[in-house]
C-alpha cells in the first residue's frame, strides 16, 4: 500500500492532544514510525478501505457475558472485533470459493478463535451465496459431547440459533428438512453435530432431493483428530452431498489417512 508522508504539524498536534510530546524524540517512537515494522504492516493492511468495510460489516459481534457485581449476577453484551487471522481466513475462504474450490483446511493455532471464526463465516458465506440466489445452511461438526456443549454456548452467546444432533436419527431429521432455517425467529442458524456417537456407522447415507438453491456448508472442528473418514459415516455423508462445502479447522494440520483434514 502507498504511504503518505507524515505531516509534522499534524503529528505535533496529535501528540499534544494526548499530552505525549515528550515521546517525540525517543528512539522507540522513531522506530514505530517505520512503515515496515510488523505492527504497522498488520494495522495498515487490515485497515485498507476494502478490509475495513469488511470488518465493519461482518467483524463485530456482541457476546453475552455474565459477571458478578455487588453479589449479583449481571448480564452484559461485550463487543468483540474480528481478529486479523479470522479476517484473513474469511477472505481467503471466500476467494477460494470464487475460484471454484469446494473444500479446504484452515490452519489456526490454539487460542486463535476457530469457533468465533465459524460464527463470522455464517454471515460472510450467507451473503456470498445470497448473491448467487442460494441459501447457505451450516453444520459445525465436533467429535465429543463436551465440545458440542462448548460450541453451542459460544454460538448462542453470539446470537446464533443453535440446533444440535447427537444421533444419526437427529441429523437425518435435520437433512430431511430442506429449509435453510429450522426456527421462525429469522436469526442466523447453525447445527452442531457430535459425530462421535455414530462415527463408525458405515450404512450408506441417503439424503433427500433438495432444491438446487440450498448450499450445505460443513465446518469440522479439530480436524486433525481421528474422524476415520475412510468408509465411515463422515465419508458417506460427504459422498451423499458432493456439492457441499467442507471447511476443516485445525491447529495441527496432519494429513494422515485417519484425519478429516486428509479428506478435505
Stretches with model-predicted labels:
Residues 1-142, 146, 150-162, 186, ...:
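ATP-dependent helicase/translocase motor core
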Amino acid at each position: 500500500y502507498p504511504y503518505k508522508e507524515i505531516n509534522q504539524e499534524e503529528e505535533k498536534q496529535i501528540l499534544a492532544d494526548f499530552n505525549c510530546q515528550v515521546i517525540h524524540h525517543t528512539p522507540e517512537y522513531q522506530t514505530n514510525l517505520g512503515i515496515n515494522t510488523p505492527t504497522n504492516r498488520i494495522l495498515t493492511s487490515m485497515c485498507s478501505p476494502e478490509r475495513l468495510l469488511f470488518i465493519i460489516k461482518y467483524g463485530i459481534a456482541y457476546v453475552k457475558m455474565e459477571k458478578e457485581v455487588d453479589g449479583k449476577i449481571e448480564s452484559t453484551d461485550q463487543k468483540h472485533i474480528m481478529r486479523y487471522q479470522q479476517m484473513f481466513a474469511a477472505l481467503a475462504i471466500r476467494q477460494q470459493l470464487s475460484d471454484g474450490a469446494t473444500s479446504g483446511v484452515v490452519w489456526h493455532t490454539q487460542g486463535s478463535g476457530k469457533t468465533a471464526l465459524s460464527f463470522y463465516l455464517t454471515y460472510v458465506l450467507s451473503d456470498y451465496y445470497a448473491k448467487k440466489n442460494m441459501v447457505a445452511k451450516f453444520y459445525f461438526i465436533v467429535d465429543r459431547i463436551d465440545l458440542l456443549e462448548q460450541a453451542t454456548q459460544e454460538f448462542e452467546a453470539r446470537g446464533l440459533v443453535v440446533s444440535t444432533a447427537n444421533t444419526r436419527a437427529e441429523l437425518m431429521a435435520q437433512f430431511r428438512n430442506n429449509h435453510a432455517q429450522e426456527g421462525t425467529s429469522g436469526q442466523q442458524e447453525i447445527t452442531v453435530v457430535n459425530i462421535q456417537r455414530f462415527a463408525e456407522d458405515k450404512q450408506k447415507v441417503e439424503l433427500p432431493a433438495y432444491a438446487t438453491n440450498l448450499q450445505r456448508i460443513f465446518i469440522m472442528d479439530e480436524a486433525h483428530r481421528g474422524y476415520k473418514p475412510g468408509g465411515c459415516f463422515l465419508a458417506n455423508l460427504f459422498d451423499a452431498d458432493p456439492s457441499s462445502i467442507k471447511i476443516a479447522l485445525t491447529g495441527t494440520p496432519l494429513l494422515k489417512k485417519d484425519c478429516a483434514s486428509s479428506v478435505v
